[in-house]
Amino acid sequence: MQFHERFDVIVVGGGHAGTEAALASARMGSKTLLLTHNIDTLGQMSCNPAIGGIGKGHLVKEIDALGGAMAVATDFAGIQFRTLNSSKGPAVRATRAQADRALYRHKIQEILQHQTNLRIFQQAVDDLVVENNKVIGVVTQMGLAFEAPAVVLTAGTFLGGKIHIGLENYSGGRAGDPPSIALAHRLRELPIRVGRLKTGTPPRIDANTIDFSLMTEQKGDNPLPVMSFIGDVNDHPEQVSCYITHTNERTHDIIRGGLDRSPMYSGIIEGIGPRYCPSIEDKINRFADKTSHQIFIEPEGLNTTEIYPNGISTSLPFDVQLNLVRSIKGMENAEIMRPGYAIEYDYFDPRDLKNSLETKAISGLFFAGQINGTTGYEEAGAQGLLAGMNASLQVQGKEAWAPRRDQAYLGVLVDDLSTLGTKEPYRMFTSRAEYRLLLREDNADLRLTEKGRELGLVDDKRWALFSEKMESIETELQRLRGQWIHPNSPLVEALNPNLNTPITREATFEDLLRRPEMDYPKLMSIDGFGPGLEDQRAAEQVQIQVKYSGYIQRQQGEIDKAIRHETTLLPLDLDYQEVPGLSNEVIAKMNEHKPETIGQASRISGMTPAAISILLVHLKKRGLLRKSA
């Protein structure tokens, strides 16, 4: 049965990747359909009730800078906000919010339902319709066919999903939801490499059975951070505390005693789990010398007693889960409301994707989120936005776009995946970015919002606020650079007590701000130097740009040198056997990875500078030197 309307873009899946993909495509004017197996679970936080953190918070800010929904929803749902690494430099500072699951889901659904050009339909997808290596639509569980020249697949952990608790297992996409078995079989027919990964979640605890007085309270920051560049602290709901406790040697003995019934250690689970979010049984095994592990006791919302014990993800049998929970300080009488479990699922090798997240094998088919081997809401949301945007661009006959590694963490994420691939769930860290001084949370809008506006992702309200902020920053920087003070100035009397050494020669206000002992609020509070900017985010930007200007210029110089050939395109039909001077090893690597650019080729493990030079000479001789947009 054919659906009565045709769409430009179809998005399959309504998690963090799917919602951002659908919203991005619709914002850009494409007639978009979001297909989900359950409208009520759109925007569901399937695992931990938190958004942001080191590396992840940077991605959220970038999604926001491009007009996405994640940061806005977090501001309306966040019940505790903290700035991590606040004592360190701005490059590694990151915002993290504890979120109320219900409020977050509600806000995402509200944004989806009010988005023009977006239709939502509840049906699981069982089949892709492909003709001549080009996608032309999908078919749902009940045989309803939808047509579109671009399809974005964001199936999360649902493809061939299998849930494990102890030695018992059953098919599922997550607890309470069915898996996508038919679609998984269909995708395995495509010429795209497939593998299995695993992730897990801890048991949920009833707060009424926890003794919080035996734990360490962890309050949020004051003043409260905001996640979105257009957000306000007044958007935040009531704020609550988290708590910290620890496992102990008794806990570890209980876990060791249950390993013979662990699906991970009995060989039942074959998928590789996340290195940076291991199960508690994996921690005990890998770090056998540690006598305790930290656990964060996180509320799941304001109107629920469910607690998420972050740090004890497990797939051990229920009786072992209960015993290990009750061995932990403050949880001696705890009751489990939902058992922890592990889930195995299909993922597809992201090296088979272009950096637009379109599959190389099937034109018009895009993958985003855990299907590409990543883990985390933020990584999924960022990919979803990029895939939805590029699906829309393709339908409009425009060239695909993806940020470079020096432009965004999203650029690092996509380049890592499409160039290097992954054999374990990929998680973003600031350490993955070589140009992290330029890729800060605070300047994500300065880096990306103008491009987002050009692409049609950024609405008038966000653009007006951004333009006002940019003008404020530029005007204030010009003022600081243009105003001078000399040793005999009447302003010196008020200034010198705030300096480590009095000024002895003429200096601009910018020179004063560059001093280690001076910051922008202090300088503006001194008579004759203020009043300065009222907008705290603009003021922060002024301070960072002044204090780090030398380092920023140096890093920009490195980038300018590095990107000289970064975007030089490698023709898809280039026969590497015909390139004189390439070793058989390099030819094999190029044929396996199929890089789109010289930059991607240079990051393939084992690729030599000599091989890159040979490729460039060959392209030049053949008149094939072209750069991507």
From Swiss-Prot:
Keywords: Cytoplasm, FAD, Flavoprotein, NAD, tRNA processing. InterPro entries: FAD/NAD-bd_sf (IPR036188), GIDA_C_N (IPR049312), MnmG (IPR004416), MnmG-rel (IPR002218), MnmG-rel_CS (IPR020595), MnmG_C (IPR026904), MnmG_C_subdom (IPR047001), MnmG_C_subdom_sf (IPR044920). Its main location: cytoplasm. NAD(+) binds at residues 273-287. FAD binds at G13, G14, G15, H16, A17, G18, V125, S180, Q370. One of its GO terms (biological process) is tRNA wobble uridine modification. PROSITE patterns: GIDA_1, GIDA_2. Coiled coil: none annotated. It is found in: Cytoplasm. GO terms for molecular function: flavin adenine dinucleotide binding. Belongs to the MnmG family. Homodimer. Heterotetramer of two MnmE and two MnmG subunits. NAD-binding protein involved in the addition of a carboxymethylaminomethyl (cmnm) group at the wobble position (U34) of certain tRNAs, forming tRNA-cmnm(5)s(2)U34. This is tRNA uridine 5-carboxymethylaminomethyl modification enzyme MnmG.
